[in-house]
C-alpha cells in the first residue's frame, strides 16, 4: 500500500545529491543496469552503534527538569531505540505504536499529515502530557503536539529552536525551505540571525547548511538538521530531545511556550495528484504568465507569491507525481 511512497536515499561523500540530483541519479541508474560496481578485498563485520549513539545523546542533551511525554513511533524504525532513549529523558513516557511493523497497521508514519497525529493528540489529552512527539518511518523527521493537543507545525518549532540557538550565538545562519511561514523568517531576524530560504528537499537543505556553515536547518516535512551541537544531519530523536531540553528550561506549559510564535491562518501541505510530465509544465506556465500586482514572486523552487499580509506557494514534488501547495495569511 505504501510502496509508491518508499524510496532509497543516496549520499555522496556525506552529502545529499544536491542540485544536480537528476544527472547523478541517472548515472547511478546506468551503473546499476550495467552491473558496474567496485569490488574490494575487505572484510565485512557486524557492529552495533546503539550504545555509542546513546552515549553521544547523553553527552549533548541536558535537562533542567523532566517532562511527561507521549511518543508515537508509528511502527517505524524509531521503535528500535526511541522508547529506550526517550524514557531516560522523560519523567514519564507513554508509548504509542513502538513495535516495528512495516505494514503500518495503525497509521502511515508520516507526521507531516495531520490525520496521522490523531492518536497522538488523543493520548496527550488523555494523559495530560506536556508534549507529544511523533517519529516518521525511518526516524529522521518528527511531528509535535503541544500540551493542549494542538499540532505544532515544523516552521513553528523551528522558530523556537532558532531562538534558542540565537540567544547563544548571534548572527547564526538558519536554513529553511520555501514552504515555511514568514513568521520563521521574522523570528530569525528579530533575534539577530540570518535567514536563508532554499528549495524544498533533504539534499538542498543539507547543501545550503554546508555552504553557509549554518547552525540549523529544517523544512515543513519535519526534517530538522542541527549543525550546532550535533552533526548536521536530520535526526528525529535528537531533534525531539533538543526540544525537551529547550522546554525543560521553561516555567510555562508547552502551549504557552509556542504561543510566542503565533500560528497564522494557514494550510498544511496540499497535494494535488498529477503525472510527472504535467506537473513541471504547470509550474513553468505559472512562472511565465502569472504575475499579479502587489505580490513579490520568489521562484527558487516553484512559485511563491508574497503580499503584505499573506503568501501562497506551489511547486512540483521531486519524489511523487503531485503538485504541492500551501497558503498563509494574517487573517482568515
Predicted regions, residues:
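Phosphate-binding and adjacent anionic-ligand microenvironments
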Residues: 9, 15, 167-326, 332
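Short, charged, surface-exposed secondary-structure boundary motifs
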Residues: 103-108, 163-165, 205-210
Amino acid at each position: 500500500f505504501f510502496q509508491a511512497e518508499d524510496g532509497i536515499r543516496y549520499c555522496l561523500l556525506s552529502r545529499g545529491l544536491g542540485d544536480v540530483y537528476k544527472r547523478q541519479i541517472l548515472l547511478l541508474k546506468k551503473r546499476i543496469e550495467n552491473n558496474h560496481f567496485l569490488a574490494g578485498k575487505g572484510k565485512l563485520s557486524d557492529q552495533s552503534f546503539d550504545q555509542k549513539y546513546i552515549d553521544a545523546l547523553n553527552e549533548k542533551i541536558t535537562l533542567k527538569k523532566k517532562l511527561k511525554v507521549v511518543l508515537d513511533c508509528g511502527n517505524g524504525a524509531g521503535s528500535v531505540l526511541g522508547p529506550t532513549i526517550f524514557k531516560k529523558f522523560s519523567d514519564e513516557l507513554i508509548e504509542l505504536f513502538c513495535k516495528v511493523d512495516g505494514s503500518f497497521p495503525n497509521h502511515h508514519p508520516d507526521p507531516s499529515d495531520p490525520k496521522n497525529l490523531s492518536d497522538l493528540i488523543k493520548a496527550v489529552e488523555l494523559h495530560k502530557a506536556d508534549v507529544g512527539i511523533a517519529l516518521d518511518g525511518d526516524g529522521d523527521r518528527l511531528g509535535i503536539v503541544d500540551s493542549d493537543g494542538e499540532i505544532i507545525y515544523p516552521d513553528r518549532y523551528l522558530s523556537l529552536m532558532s531562538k534558542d540557538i540565537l540567544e547563544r550565538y548571534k548572527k547564526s545562519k538558519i536554513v529553511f525551505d520555501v514552504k515555511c511561514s514568514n513568521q520563521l523568517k521574522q523570528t530569525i531576524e528579530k533575534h539577530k540571525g540570518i535567514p536563508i530560504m532554499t528549495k524544498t528537499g533533504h539534499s538542498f537543505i543539507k547543501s545550503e547548511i554546508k555552504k553557509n556553515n549554518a547552525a540549523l536547518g529544517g523544512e515543513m516535512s519535519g526534517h530538522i538538521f542541527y549543525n550546532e551541537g550535533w552533526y548536521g544531519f536530520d535526526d528525529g530523536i535528537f531533534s525531539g530531545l533538543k526540544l525537551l531540553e529547550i522546554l525543560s528550561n521553561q516555567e510555562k506549559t508547552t502551549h504557552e511556550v509556542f504561543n510566542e510564535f503565533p500560528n497564522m491562518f494557514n494550510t498544511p501541505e496540499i497535494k494535488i495528484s498529477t503525472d510527472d510530465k504535467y506537473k513541471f509544465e504547470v509550474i513553468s506556465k505559472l512562472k511565465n504568465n502569472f504575475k499579479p500586482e502587489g505580490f513579490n514572486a520568489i521562484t527558487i523552487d516553484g512559485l511563491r507569491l508574497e503580499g503584505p499580509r499573506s503568501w501562497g506557494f506551489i511547486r512540483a514534488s521531486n519524489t511523487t507525481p503531485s503538485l504541492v501547495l500551501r497558503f498563509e495569511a494574517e487573517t482568515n
